[in-house]
UniProtKB/Swiss-Prot annotation:
Top-rank lineage group of the source organism: Bacteria
Keyword terms, alphabetized: Acetylation, Isopeptide bond, Metal-binding, NADP, Oxidoreductase, Ubl conjugation, Zinc
Designated name of the protein: NADP-dependent alcohol dehydrogenase C
GO cellular component terms, A-Z: cytosol; peptidoglycan-based cell wall; plasma membrane
Source organism (scientific name): Mycobacterium tuberculosis (strain ATCC 25618 / H37Rv)
EC numbers for this chain: 1.1.1.2
Gene3D superfamilies: Medium-chain alcohol dehydrogenases, catalytic domain, NAD(P)-binding Rossmann-like Domain
SUPFAM superfamilies hit by this protein: GroES-like, NAD(P)-binding Rossmann-fold domains
Gene name per UniProt: adhC
Record: residues binding Zn(2+) 2: C94, C97, C100, C108
C-alpha cells in the first residue's frame, strides 16, 4: 500500500479538501500510474453533491486521468514504465456478460466498477483522479498517442468518448446532418468530432453568444433555440441530434427537427422525466435513444482518431487549490470549455 495526496469531498455540503488516500500495491495484472492531469467533469459535481444518490464519502472524484506508468505487475504485457496512459470512467467490469464480451464494458450487466464512488473487487471504495497516483488493471488503461499533450488528452477520456461513441454508432460522416444541442464541455467536443468525421454540423444553443466559437470549432451553422422561428426553419433538417444538456426540454420540438428515420440521442441526464410525444416519433419513423461513454476498445479508437485528426478539447488549466472555484464556475457555465487540474501542483 502507498499513501498519496488527493482532493476529496467529505460531504455533500462541504468544499473539497486536501487529504491523503491509500493505493494498493500493483498486482500481477496492474499498472501503477503517476497522474499528471485530471479533467473536471460535471458528473464529478453531481456525485459529490449527492445529486445522483448517496456517495461513499470521502469521495475523490476524477475520471479523466492522464499520466505516466511508474510500475507494472509481473504479468502485464500491454504497458511498461514510462508509457503515456489514461484512465476513463471505469476501472473494471465483470468481463463475462454479453456487454463485456462485445467490448461495450460501460454497459456491463452486473455493473462496471467506476473510477470513483464504486466498490472494487477487493471490497474497497474506488477513488479517482484528483490524486497523485492510481493503480488500475492493464485491461482498463488507455494508451495516449505521443502527439496528444497529456493535459488536453485528459478530457477526451469522458467528454471525448461521450460524443465519439454516438457519432460512430449512428454513422455520422459525409452527407450526414448532425445537430449538437448545447455548446459546453460536451457540446464543443461534438462539434469538433462531428466536423472531423465529415458531417455537416449545426449547433443549437439558447442564444447566439457562443456563435463565433461554434463556427470556429467546425460548425457550419448555429441557431438560437430561444427564437421560436428556429424550429420552423429547421423542421425535418437533421439525421442525428445529440443532446448534451441536462435541462428538461420540449422533446417534441426537437424530434420534429429530425428527418425520416432520424435519431435524437440523450447524453445529458435531466433532473426530471420528460414527456415523449408519440406522434413525433411514429409519423416519421424517428427514434429517441441514449448513449453512455464508450468501451475500452472504442475509447482507444477515439484517442487514435483525435491524434490523427488533431482534435483536442479547449481547456483551462488550474491548480488543485482552485477546484472548488472551478466547480462554481462549471455550475455557472463559465468555462470554455473544460477545466483540467495540474496534479503536479498537488
Amino acid at each position: 500500500m502507498s499513501t498519496v495526496a488527493a482532493y476529496a469531498a467529505m460531504s455533500a455540503t462541504e468544499p473539497l479538501t486536501k487529504t491523503t488516500i491509500t493505493r494498493r500495491d500493483p498486482g500481477p495484472h496492474d499498472v501503477a500510474i503517476d497522474i499528471k492531469f485530471a479533467g473536471i467533469c460535471h458528473s464529478d459535481i453531481h456525485t459529490v453533491k449527492a445529486e445522483w444518490g448517496q456517495p461513499n464519502y470521502p469521495v475523490v472524484p476524477g475520471h479523466e486521468i492522464a499520466g505516466v506508468v511508474t510500475a507494472v505487475g509481473s504479468e502485464v504485457t500491454k504497458y511498461r514504465q514510462g508509457d503515456r496512459v489514461g484512465v476513463g470512467c471505469f476501472v473494471d467490469s465483470c468481463r463475462e456478460c454479453n456487454s463485456c464480451t462485445r467490448g461495450i464494458e460501460q454497459y456491463c450487466k452486473p455493473g462496471a466498477n467506476f473510477t470513483y464512488n464504486s466498490i472494487g473487487k477487493d471490497g474497497q471504495p474506488t477513488q479517482g483522479g484528483y490524486s497523485e497516483a492510481i493503480v488500475v488493471d492493464e485491461n482498463y488503461v488507455l494508451r495516449i498517442p505521443d502527439v496528444l499533450p497529456l493535459d488536453v488528452a485528459a478530457p477526451l477520456l469522458c467528454a471525448g468518448i461521450t460524443l465519439y461513441s454516438p457519432l460512430r454508432h449512428w454513422n455520422a460522416g459525409a452527407n450526414t446532418r448532425v445537430a449538437i444541442i448545447g455548446l459546453g464541455g460536451l457540446g464543443h467536443m461534438g462539434v469538433k468530432l462531428g466536423a472531423a468525421m465529415g458531417a455537416d454540423v449545426t449547433v443549437l444553443s439558447q442564444s447566439l453568444k457562443k456563435m463565433e466559437d461554434g463556427l470556429r470549432l467546425g460548425a457550419k451553422s448555429y441557431y438560437a433555440t430561444a427564437d421560436p422561428d428556429t424550429f420552423r426553419k429547421l423542421r425535418g433538417g437533421f439525421d442525428l441530434i445529440l443532446n448534451t444538456v441536462s435541462a428538461n426540454l420540449d422533446l417534441g420540438q426537437y424530434l420534429n427537427l429530425l428527418d425520416v428515420d432520424g435519431t435524437l440521442v440523450e447524453l445529458g441526464i435531466p433532473e426530471h422525466p420528460m414527456a415523449v410525444p408519440a406522434f413525433a416519433l411514429a409519423l416519421m419513423r424517428r427514434s429517441l435513444a441514449g448513449s453512455n461513454i464508450g468501451g475500452i476498445a472504442e475509447t482507444q479508437e477515439m484517442l487514435n482518431f483525435c491524434a490523427e485528426h488533431g482534435v483536442t478539447p479547449e481547456i483551462e488549466l488550474i491548480e488543485p487549490d482552485y477546484i472548488n472555484d472551478a466547480y462554481e464556475r462549471v455550475l455557472a457555465s463559465d468555462v470554455r470549455y473544460r477545466f483540467v487540474i495540474d496534479i503536479s501542483a498537488l
